[in-house]
Amino acid sequence: MKLAVHITFFYRDEKLDDRWTNAKDKFPYLRKIINEYNQYPLKVDIFIHTNKKFNLLDLKYNTYTNGKIQLIKHNLYKYSLFKGKNYYLTWASRKTIKKQRNEYDFFIYQEDDIFIPLNAFNYWQTNKQDCLKNNLNLGFLRIELKDEIEYVSDLDMKIDKLMNLDKREYVINDVNPYCAFWIYDKTELNKWIKSKFWDLKNIHGKGAIVSNKLEKIGLNNFPILRYLIYSYKNKRPDSAMEASAIGINGLNLGWYKNTVLPIKNSNVDPDCRIYHLSNYYANEYETNMGTIKFDEIIS
């Protein structure tokens, strides 16, 4: 059995006054991520997609014996006219993933500060099939730490809708299934690739790369004009990043009936936890994200 892991890593030398850390601040995240994949009980090949080449040895991870690690540099020139063009680095891995679709048994796409412990992978393997046969998505919760307390980063309200599935109780996450990564087996990935949703423009907002207005006046074949209109229609450039990391789990896509999490000891199964290593939301005060404790997520 083989797993392909695709990580988007935006390399920036300087640290600006915003939430995006520079490359050297993020190296410890990548090191922790790589060291964990080295413990997985199957071959894990890691592909790091970046805008700038760097020496992998600078990460100072343990000797990797569980597969290969490959750095792939991408040019973002085709997105030069888009607002927030750097966010579109998150789209760059799609071509490679499509080429690999029959070479691996499982696929993960993740952002560069997402830590997926082995027990979370085992949780997915154990529960995914029961969910898929009922057209449900098995959910995860992205966890952040504040004062050593675990908070759920992506939910601003508790979840409370329960359901039974094959004599087991689940809770429905109809608030926000996003957790900055996705995981699918080869069968599910190939279904996605054959669908219209493999084109991320069908997930990223309501903008269309093909403009009806340009078509009417005979200018639809000019890519610069198409890019400008698409960028204008999509007001939040960071939603390009979210479109890549949500996979086919989005609430408005209709691919699955719901995203669900199994109940264990009156709370969600603790193995559903994956970790946002930057701990950003739990330590900011501008939103309600990251304010609900993990052990209180079910109301």
Where are the language model's segments positioned?
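Active-site-proximal specificity loops/subdomain of glycosyltransferases
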Residues: 54-105
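Short, acidic, metal-binding catalytic loop of nucleotide-sugar glycosyltransferases
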Residues: 23-44
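Short beta-strand-to-loop acidic/aromatic patch adjacent to the donor-nucleotide binding site
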Residues: 104-115
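Conserved catalytic core of nucleotide-sugar-dependent glycosyltransferases
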Residues: 86, 117-216
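Short beta-strand/loop segment that forms part of the nucleotide-sugar
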Residues: 43-53
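A conserved hydrophobic helix/loop-capping motif in glycosyltransferases and polysaccharide synthases
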Residues: 4-23
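Phosphate/oxyanion-binding active-site loops and adjacent basic polyanion-contact surfaces
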Residues: 19-30, 81-93, 116-120, 177, ...
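C-terminal catalytic/acceptor-binding lobe
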Residues: 195-299
